[in-house]
Amino acid sequence: MGFDLYGMKPEVDTPKPEWTKADPYIITEKEGVMQIDPQVKEEYDDFMKEQWKWRDENEGSYFRSNVWWWRPLWTFVCRVCDNVLTSEDYERGSSNDGYRISKTKTKRIASRLRKLIDSGYVKSYEKWYKREQGKLDEKDWDKNYPFSTAHVKEFERFCEKSGGFEIH
């Protein structure tokens, strides 16, 4: 399971690529499964590469994190933004059911994270987190949940430019 966050009104620098042709997916007769039509596969693959490039260039449009990375990040954000986010935000942000975090809140999250990054707090927290993880038994599931300053920085940029976001 992963968490896909979509900016609701992202600040964009370039136009978003759009697929203007018919639905590229077909259902195969033999297996009865959905796949990309072989006649448009190469063109659709190129389109998807452009989509990913656009997402990378427009930081507020999309943020993704697998469950292992998301949980420590979201827990950290909720702790350091406890006067910004509600307990409902914390609970619903731990699920990927389309919950929304407003533009006002995401701007405040970004501002707080930026201050904590610039002050060195996030780096110190990362060191503490890794030290505590190192004390865990190898069989402890919590050992599989990483945390990094780089991930916080990426999330801060997304929050700053997302215009609010939905969690899927």
Model-identified regions with their sequence ranges:
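Acidic (Asp/Glu-rich) sequence patches and key acidic residues
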Residues: M1-H168
